[in-house]
Each structure stands twice: as structure tokens, then as C-alpha cells.
Amino acid sequence: MASAEIIAVGTELLLGQIVNSNAAFISQELAADGIYVYHHTVVGDNPARLKEVIEIAENRSDILIFTGGLGPTEDDITKQILAAHLQKQLVEDEYHMNKINEYFTSRNRAMTENNKLQAVIIEDSIVLNNDFGFAAGMYLRENNHTYVLLPGPPSEMKPMFTSYANPLLLSESGDQNILESKIMRFFGIGESQLAADLNDLIVTQVNPTIATYAGDNEVVVRITATAKTKEEASRLVKDTEEEILRRDGTFLYGYGEVSLSELVTAMLLEKELTISAAESFTAGLFQAEIARFPGISKIFKGGMVTYSEETKQSILQVSPQVIKEKGVVSAECAKEMAENVSRLCKTDIGISFTGVAGPDSLEGHPAGTIWIGLSVKGYETEAFQFVYGRDRNHNRRRAVKQGFQLIKQFLDAN
């Protein structure tokens, strides 16, 4: 089985100015391909050190994947150093040169000479088109090694890898097996607990393989199987999926790359249910999240951010008696907030968020104590309590995701 090394080029990575998210993405994709990544390397924009890294990588890896250093500036040196190392010439790629020329011509701007560097490639390489930028990527087989050169910006790198580089890697892997992969997304359970629940499957795994990843307040499980036929590979994945669902299916919210908020929004659109939100400590995060999706104006009618007791009473019309007797961190307050925003905005669903963001306590409640109210036309209003930690922004983000999960659970049941 081929081994790969990912080499990220850029001094900004070493200085901590940019996080190397490219390596994580490529590693996950290669794992699904059955290609093992044994090394991640980060090197600055220094010719001597980059050459040294290339030589080290060639001694231990079959596939060298570079990210970064393909741009027009003096510190973009990746292809120049690799070309010299392989004793290859640099040549101009017509497609990318025309693309750059057209860009500047259409804007009536003069193209500086250094921009042409983005259209320069190593001779004998397969050009990887950059659909979202100008720097050409490259795929090259030389001396029993495969070299893949990708741009640094993730918005350019990811589509280039997915559309052009990865199919080439798969075609040359020599493995004629069919590969099937499925991503499962869980909310409300930690990675350590999920991994513990699946421990016997993970420890004894051969085919399929199971990998767990901690996401943003969620856990991702990836099942990957190989077989001689698509049907057999799919069956292997399905059997493992069913076993995982048997153990932790109550925490599953979806599959693939669809986020929880995107999934819930699609469900609301399909059912033509309108929604509004009243937010206290989340300060509009729920509304900002749901507003990200196209067509949302059909169902999202508006909302209110009522951070203080005064605005909860004056704008959201929460009863002063409820606030005085029960406090703002209470089921009663959460219910009234949800009911009132639904009534004021004339929506089918009203959701509310109130609680203690942290790190300090409030009304005797520890940081991370939250209440989410859910009011649905024709149903009894409910309030749900959750207790998180002391991290303020983590609590706010998690509460918003919890709100989407509560809506999904209601929609699934009704």
C-alpha cells in the first residue's frame, strides 16, 4: 500500500499565523482512498530547508503532496525548488496564462510580470486546473515517486484535490478494489464516549475501518470498506453502520457533509413551517446561523435579542412576575420567551435561549446553565435544561446547535 507525506510550505504556518487545515483535509481524503499518511511536515519559505525536506520525504514516502508556495511572490518557491531537485525545466501552461490575462484585461488593469509565475509548471507534469484561482497545480511521476503540488488557500486547494488530484491518485494506486465510505454525524455525545461505545469494533477493525473525529460540538464517524464489487463494499459499510446505530443511534443527526443547522432548515422549508427566535445569552447566534441558507426568508420571519431583564419585559413582553419569582434562568422564562416571539412574529415555531453564558454565575446558577424553550402551534410549550462548562463562547455555540437538535427531534416525531 502506498504511503504519503504532506508537506505544507509557508513561513506563516511556522509562525502560527495560519492553521494548517489543508493537512487535515488531505489526510482524511487519503485515508478514505486507502493511502496511508505517515508524516506531516511544515517548512518555511527557505530554499535550502525545502530541498532538505524533499530529500527526507523521498526516503520514507511514495507520494509527496505539497500545499502552498505556488503564488506570484518571491517567497513562493515550491515548484522552483522541486523542479531544480528533479532537474526539470519550468514551462508555461497556456490555460492558466490565458485565464490570468483575461482577468486583467476584463478589468482594464496591467498585469505585473510576477503574476505569470502562477501559470508556470514543471515540465512533464499533468496540470491540475485551478477552478477558483490562478495558480496551476501539478501532478508528476518521477523516479518511483508521485509529486502533487497544490495551492495553499483551502478554497482553491480542496476543489483541486477533489476534482483533479485525487482521481489521479486512485487511478495509479494499483488497487482494483472498490472503495465505499460513509460519514455519520452525532450530536449530544462526546468523542471519548462514542469511541468507548465502539471500542471493540475499533480495536478489531480490519475491513471496514472506523474513524472518529471531534467536530464543532459534534462527533463525526467515518466508515470505509473495500471490496471487489460496489455491492459487497456497500454491504460491509451498511452492516457496520447498523451496529453503530444500535449502540448510539439516538445521537445521530445526519450523514455526509450536511450540518445540523442546514438539515433542520431544509426540513422546515420542506414542511413549510415558519420560525422565529428570542435570544438572550446567545445574542443572535441562532438567527445568524439559520440566515446563512438560501431561501430562508420563506420560513424565518424574524427574532429578538433581549439580553437584559428590561428588554425581556418591554420588547418580548415576558411577565415581570415570572422574572421576579422564577428569574431569567428558568423554564418559565424560556417558555414565555418562545411563546411570545412566536405570537409577535406570527410563526408556527418559536424558540428561545436564556441562561448563564459564563464564566460567572447568575441568580445562583453556575456558568453553563441554559434553558431552551420550544413553542409549536398546536402543541404544549416545552423548556429544556442543559448544563455545560465555563467557556462562554463554547456554551453559546453549543446551545445554538442544541436548539437545532430540539427542532429536529420535534420534526422527526411529528
Swiss-Prot record:
HAMAP family: CinA_B. NCBIfam families: cinA_nterm, molyb_syn, PncC_domain, PRK00549.1. It comes from the Bacteria. It holds the Pfam family MoCF_biosynth. Belongs to the CinA family. The gene is cinA. SMART domains: MoCF_biosynth. Disulfide bonds: none annotated. InterPro entries: CinA (IPR050101), CinA-like_C (IPR036653), CinA_C (IPR008136), CinA_KH (IPR041424), Competence-induced_CinA (IPR008135), MoaB/Mog-like_dom_sf (IPR036425), MoaB/Mog_dom (IPR001453). This is Putative competence-damage inducible protein. It comes from Listeria monocytogenes serotype 4a (strain HCC23).
